[in-house]
């Protein structure tokens, strides 16, 4: 090869290779690839550490319930809460430390914020609690920009997707991973929040064939929390979410059940007891202990397949 023509041939080769690369590379590859989930920063790094987060929005949902939105350390942060887990809020109220557990209604895919839906128990509205709820009233009195301490993740149940649940009998035990085809859910009042968290995770995954059946108990129709969200999921995923309501004091024309959760209601609206059916419950202790557990056992559900938040 002529020494003078060698640089020309090399230059032409570089141009050809560059043109071929630009022509053959996939469309849209100029954009920055999305961050893998494990690279997205998480706000909750250590379950023993308290993380102060600021209140950035407050929205009234109904007569006694509000949605509180807290900001995460940056717009790219997620909370870092596995499905099935909850967080603890802690605050000094009248000189005493008050700690309460909550399950966010926002997804852990949401970046930059976390949402809590809280029923506010005001003073002198419930004869058994004349002082009202300490934490709920504290939240209600927070101003935009005020911070409160978050701690987590916490809880004995984690949903790993596609019917796989890691469940611990207590905090000191190792989790046992079990697979279920159907999740029977019973919720009362604000106990709907962990159910919605689980329902959203299951219905968001088109490859997850797990079916959820939910009985949701409330006092009146106006007390039904997150009804629009539940009804929307049911409309969009009728084969994956079976939804039923019951009210203590229904209005005229109410088309669902009336009264406390009972065995007949469970038989009609939950899957029959089986080894591949998991029952999860969350609500007032009296409802769980007096209405739910005895009737579930009577219908043949095994204790090892029943989980109460």
From Swiss-Prot:
Pfam families from the UniProt entry: FAD_binding_6, NAD_binding_1
Keywords for this protein: FAD, Flavoprotein, Lipid biosynthesis, Lipid metabolism, Membrane, NAD, Oxidoreductase, Steroid biosynthesis, Steroid metabolism, Sterol biosynthesis, Sterol metabolism, Transmembrane, Transmembrane helix
GO CC annotations, alphabetized: membrane; mitochondrion
GO biological-process terms attached to the record: response to yeast; sterol biosynthetic process
Record-linked InterPro entries: CBR-like (IPR001834), Cbr1-like_FAD-bd_dom (IPR008333), FAD-bd_FR_type (IPR017927), Flavoprot_Pyr_Nucl_cyt_Rdtase (IPR001709), FNR_nucleotide-bd (IPR039261), OxRdtase_FAD/NAD-bd (IPR001433), Riboflavin_synthase-like_b-brl (IPR017938)
Binding site for FAD: 140-170, 179-214
Domain of life, source organism: Eukaryota
Transmembrane segments: 3-23
Reaction(s) catalysed by this chain's protein: 2 Fe(III)-[cytochrome b5] + NADH = 2 Fe(II)-[cytochrome b5] + NAD(+) + H(+)
Entry cofactors: FAD
Enzyme Commission numbers on file: 1.6.2.2
Domain FAD-binding FR-type span(s) in chain numbering: 48-160
Membrane topology listed for this record: Single-pass membrane protein
Subcellular location(s) of the protein: Membrane
Entry GO MF terms: cytochrome-b5 reductase activity, acting on NAD(P)H; FAD binding
Biological role: NADH-cytochrome b5 reductases are involved in desaturation and elongation of fatty acids, cholesterol biosynthesis and drug metabolism.
Similarity field: Belongs to the flavoprotein pyridine nucleotide cytochrome reductase family.
Name assigned to this protein: NADH-cytochrome b5 reductase 2
């Amino acid at each position: 090869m002529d020494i003078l023509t060698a640089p020309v041939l090399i230059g032409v080769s570089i141009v050809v290779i560059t043109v071929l690369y630009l022509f053959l590379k996939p469309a849209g590859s100029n954009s920055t690839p999305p961050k893998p989930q494990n690279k997205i920063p998480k706000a909750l790094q250590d379950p023993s550490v308290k993380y102060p987060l600021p209140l950035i929005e407050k929205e009234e949902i109904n007569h006694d319930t509000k949605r509180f939105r807290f900001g995460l350390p940056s717009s790219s942060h997620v909370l870092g809460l596995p499905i099935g887990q909850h967080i603890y809020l802690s605050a000094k109220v009248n000189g005493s430390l008050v700690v309460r557990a909550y399950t966010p209604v926002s997804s852990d895919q949401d970046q930059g914020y976390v949402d809590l839906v809280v029923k506010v128990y005001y003073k002198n509205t419930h004869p058994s609690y004349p002082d009202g709820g300490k934490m709920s009233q504290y939240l209600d009195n927070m101003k935009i920009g005020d911070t409160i301490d978050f701690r987590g993740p916490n809880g004995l149940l984690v949903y790993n997707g596609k019917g796989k649940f890691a469940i611990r009998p207590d905090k000191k035990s190792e989790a046992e991973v079990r697979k279920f085809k159907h999740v029977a859910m019973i919720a009362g009042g604000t106990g709907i929040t962990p159910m919605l968290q689980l329902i959203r995770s299951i219905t968001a995954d088109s490859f997850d064939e797990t079916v959820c059946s939910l009985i949701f108990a409330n006092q009146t129709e106006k007390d039904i929390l997150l009804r629009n969200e539940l009804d929307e999921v049911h409309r969009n995923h009728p084969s994956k979410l079976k939804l039923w309501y019951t009210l203590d004091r229904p209005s005229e024309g109410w088309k669902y059940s009336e009264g406390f959760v009972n065995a007949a209601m469970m038989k009609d609206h939950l899957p029959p007891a089986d080894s591949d059916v998991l029952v999860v419950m969350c609500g007032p202790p009296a409802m769980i202990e007096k209405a739910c557990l005895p009737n579930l056992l009577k219908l043949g559900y095994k204790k090892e397949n029943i989980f109460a938040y």
